[in-house]
UniProtKB/Swiss-Prot annotation:
Residues 54-66, 141-195, 202-221 have a biased composition (Low complexity). Belongs to the TRAFAC class translation factor GTPase superfamily. Classic translation factor GTPase family. IF-2 subfamily. Its main location: cytoplasm. The gene is infB. PANTHER family: TR-TYPE G DOMAIN-CONTAINING PROTEIN, TRANSLATION INITIATION FACTOR IF-2-RELATED. This is Translation initiation factor IF-2. GTP binds at residues 383-390, 430-434, 484-487.
Length: 875
């Protein structure tokens, strides 16, 4: 029900408040006979007419507008008829009506939004034209001002027009939508603007055709001043207000209220700005000059990578290579020379680099003469085992190192520095004398300044003494001969000097240039003279180094300590090594955490010729590697990674594969027995010496295969490797840790512990011989000639022999040959002489034999009888 329902009544209705709600009851029926009464209230809907509908006759009032008004837009559609009363509507009809109203409201909002956009567009065009005309007029007035000073009287009509404009503006318009059209803005100030506005009218086809026209007499164009032109237009009525008054507000309508006025997206704004920017620079675009780049080209590079470095298209590079006759793709690798041709052709500069540039080469880095300062000499003591090298060094240092060495022999290279009575410093290197430590002696000879050749006066020149002489000559360092054990009665120094002549070593006592001295480590005789000669030789050499630079050192020995980690005994060649320096040594890098001298004291810096023990290296380096201090950890890691890659490539490098090589390798593998080993030593030099010594005892029948060799305690990985390969673990001065010991006991892995190297080599040699098995030794004891063959029994044949040489015994092995070709290998099963069985027949006698498992016997064959003895093999 609504307020518009007018029912006829006989009398006047009683006074009272009208209720906007009508109540009623609805009976609901459910299953199982249940019912329920619900009170339903129906609210009346209040209808409000749109403004202007109540006074339709006010439309002619628009004729009072003095300015020519463009065609008015069509009036809004009449409001829909009021919906039927709620009491006469079903629920489905109500839903359909609400949906229809919501759809009509949405379409009306969309139409209003389109009209608003069209109005804004027309208004912007009109404003732009107005500004252009004002600018042109201002320029014309400025140009005409000097010629016609009386011209300002012309715009006298402007105030009158300005006065008449406000009177015409507030005239009521029949249609409320006319006030929102762009024509409601002030009329243009100049007459030529009117035809332009008329031309712009057909540009809005989106506006629907008008339903009625307001007759307006064409008025003369009125020239208005700028103030009137800038007067703001009448405030436009908000669409939301009209929507609010336009009937019932529904949920759908409220949610879709702003759908027609959607803002521009961020992407649309970006596209518009980019379009403006391109339009702005369109006239200024000029061909850019090609940028010349410095292109870094390694030894090998792909076409795509080269194109990226040149900032060129990869397809252009491929085309250029095609012109050069090279059919390549962008993923193929080209060499440095081809890359240089491409870089030059495209107008860039090339910078050649090589992978080896990542490495450090200090050989060409020579210190200036003025920066060099005197340094202590480095003296290496070399000689045969048990000739008293360590005892001599103990006498010089005042220590007793010999007593703590296993077997009384030196198996590590030691570095010490002593201070003489005169305050001078001398660095000594003690090298092992055993034949297995050749590499240690070579390293000692290469890093030293002076070599002291120790020869026992009661023993003479031995193999390792001669080897030390050759190493010294190869290193090109001066030599001092120390003839030891002068306290023994068998001491014969003159005999030693004469033996040295065989190796082109002439001592001063025999008019030569090699110094010699007779010493005794037990009594101390000759030690002062030895030190004096060392200092004299060092003075002649003029040993100098630059201490004020980055340090360089040589690794003398390296090991893995359980508590300290990787340790390296280094000898500083030049510069000063300090705590905190970043270093790279071989394939390892790190930072100096601490340094210890030969007495175990911590030092902060180590100058030239000072041996120190360095802590802080990432891994155990190889003995003989060069330690170099670098500027940063990144540089150290780069150098270490490059050296590691190079070492891996060298280790895994193989010869070109061919069928011949494959078959020969397969045959060699089948013919040679391999004896696998896992080796762990206390220091790097000992591990190296053990590997070299074991490789020397390999033969053509059996050879040692080192599965792994390292420094430090035996670990679980070593045990697992040994178990998988069936190899024994050899520990040299090391023991397994707790977990490894448990694995060894559980898996029954063989372990061998040694502390003297020659005991290790002897044991492995006997083990390898046992793998070969006993050796069969054949000894020929007699020969005979077959004179006649006759049958013996049903199948066998007997041979009548004449013993030519030696003796023939029953049960011995025999070879039957015919024309110097072995026919069969057999055994003498029966031996008779004149029908009697005899144990043996000597030379010159005849006999009959029955050979086992063979009947291929002919007259004239030769029979060779031999004994077989099984002996244990030796290597």
């Amino acid at each position: 029900m609504s307020d518009s329902d007018k029912k006829p009544t006989l009398g006047r209705r009683p006074l009272g408040l009208k209720t906007a709600v009508e109540a009623g009851e609805v009976k609901q029926t459910f299953s199982h006979g249940r019912t329920n009464k619900v009170v339903v209230e129906v609210k009346r809907r209040k209808l409000m007419g749109r403004p202007g509908e109540a006074a339709p006759t006010a439309a002619p009032a628009a004729a009072a507008t003095p300015a020519p008004t463009p065609v008015a837009p069509p009036p809004p559609p009449p409001p829909p008829p009021p919906p039927p009363s709620a009491s006469r509507e079903t629920r489905q009809e109500m839903q359909v009506r609400l949906l229809r109203e919501a759809e009509e409201a949405r379409l009306a909002a969309l139409e209003a939004a389109n009209r608003r956009e069209q109005e804004e567009r027309l208004r912007a065009i009109e404003e732009e034209r107005r500004r252009a005309e004002e600018k042109a007029r201002a320029e014309a007035e400025a140009a005409a001002a000097p010629a016609a000073p009386a011209a300002p009287a012309a715009p006298s009509a402007a105030p009158a027009a300005a006065q008449s404009a406000p009177e015409a503006a507030p005239a009521p318009v029949a249609e409320p939508e006319v006030a929102r059209q762009p024509e409601a803005a002030p009329v243009a100030a100049t007459a030529p603007a009117a035809p332009k506005a008329e031309e712009a009218k057909p540009a809005a086809p989106a506006v629907p055709a008008p339903r009625r026209f307001t007759p307006v007499a064409p008025a003369a164009p009125i020239k208005r001043p700028e103030l009137a032109a800038k007067k703001p237009a009448h405030p436009q009525r908000d669409r939301k207000t009209e929507d609010r008054r336009g009937g019932k507000l529904t949920v759908t309508r409220a949610l879709n209220e702003d759908e027609g006025a959607r803002a521009r997206s961020l992407a649309a704004l970006k596209r518009a700005r980019e379009k403006e920017r391109r339009a702005h620079f369109a006239g200024q675009s000029q061909p850019r000059e090609k940028q010349v780049r410095d292109v870094v080209v390694p030894d090998a590079i792909t076409v795509q990578d080269l194109a990226n470095r040149m900032a060129e298209k990869a397809a252009d590079l491929v085309k250029a290579l095609f012109k050069m006759g090279m059919m390549v793709t962008i993923n193929q690798t080209i060499d440095q020379d081809t890359a240089e041709l491409l870089v030059t052709e495209f107008g860039h500069n090339i910078q050649r680099v090589s992978e080896s540039d990542a490495d450090i080469d200090t050989s060409a880095d020579v210190d200036p003469e003025e920066s060099l300062k005197a340094r202590p000499p480095v003296v290496t003591i070399m000689g045969h085992v048990d000739h008293g090298k360590t005892s001599l060094l103990d006498a010089l240092r005042g220590t007793d190192v010999v007593r703590g060495e296993a077997g009384g022999i030196t198996q590590h290279i030691g570095a010490y520095q002593i201070k003489t009575k005169g305050g001078d410093f001398i660095t000594f290197l003690d090298t092992p004398g055993h034949e297995a430590f050749t590499e240690m002696r070579i390293r000692g000879a290469n890093v030293t300044d002076i070599v002291i050749l120790v020869v026992a006066g009661d023993d003479g020149l031995m193999p390792q003494t001669i080897e030390a002489i050759n190493h010294t000559k190869a290193a090109g360092v001066p030599m001092i001969v120390a003839i030891t054990k002068a306290d023994k009665p068998e001491f014969q120094p003159q005999k030693i000097r004469e033996r040295l002549l065989e190796h082109e070593i002439i001592v001063e006592a025999m008019s030569g240039d090699v110094q010699d001295v007779e010493v005794s480590a037990k009594t101390g005789a000759g030690l002062d003279e030895l030190i004096e000669k060392i200092l004299l030789q060092a003075e002649l050499l003029e040993l100098k180094a630059n201490p004020d630079r980055s340090a360089e050192a040589t690794v003398i020995e390296a090991k893995l300590d359980k508590g300290k980690g990787p340790l390296a005994t280094v000898l500083v060649n030049r510069g000063t090594l300090k705590v905190g320096d970043i270093l790279v040594v071989g394939t390892q890098s790190g930072r100096v955490r601490a340094m210890l001298d030969d007495k175990g004291r911590q030092v902060k810096a180590a100058g030239p010729s000072l041996p120190v023990e360095v802590l802080g290296i990432g891994g155990v380096p190889m003995a003989g590697d060069t330690l170099t201090v670098v500027e940063s950890e990144a540089r150290a890691r780069e150098v270490a990674a490059y050296r590691q890659e190079r070492a891996t490539a060298k280790r895994t490098a193989q010869a070109p594969a061919s069928l011949e090589n494959m078959f020969s390798a397969l045959a060699a593998k089948n013919a040679v027995i391999e004896y696998p080993l896992v080796i762990r030593a206390d220091v790097q030099g000992s591990a190296e010496a053990i590997v070299n010594a074991l490789n020397k005892i390999s033969t053509d029948e059996i050879k040692v295969r080192i599965l792994a060799s390292g420094v430090g305690a035996i670990t679980e990985s070593d045990v697992n490797l040994a178990q998988a390969s069936g190899a024994p673990i050899v520990g040299f001065n090391v023991r397994p840790n707790a977990k490894a010991r448990e694995l060894i006991e559980r898996n029954k892995v063989r372990m061998k512990y040694f502390d003297v190297i020659y005991q290790l080599t002897d044991d492995i040699r006997s083990e390898m011989a046992g793998e070969l098995g006993p050796e069969a030794i054949e000894t020929v004891v007699g020969r005979a000639e077959v004179k006649e063959v006759f049958p013996a029994g049903k199948r066998d044949k007997a041979a009548g022999l004449l013993v030519v040489e030696g003796v023939i015994r029953k049960g011995l092995h025999a070879r039957l040959t015919r024309n110097d070709v072995i026919v069969s290998r057999t055994t003498i099963a029966s031996l008779r002489r004149f029908k009697d069985d005899v144990p043996e027949v000597r030379a010159g006698l005849e006999c009959g034999v029955l050979l086992q498992d063979t009947n291929d016997i002919k007259a004239g064959d030769q029979l060779e009888v031999f004994e077989v003895e099984m002996r244990e093999r030796t290597l």
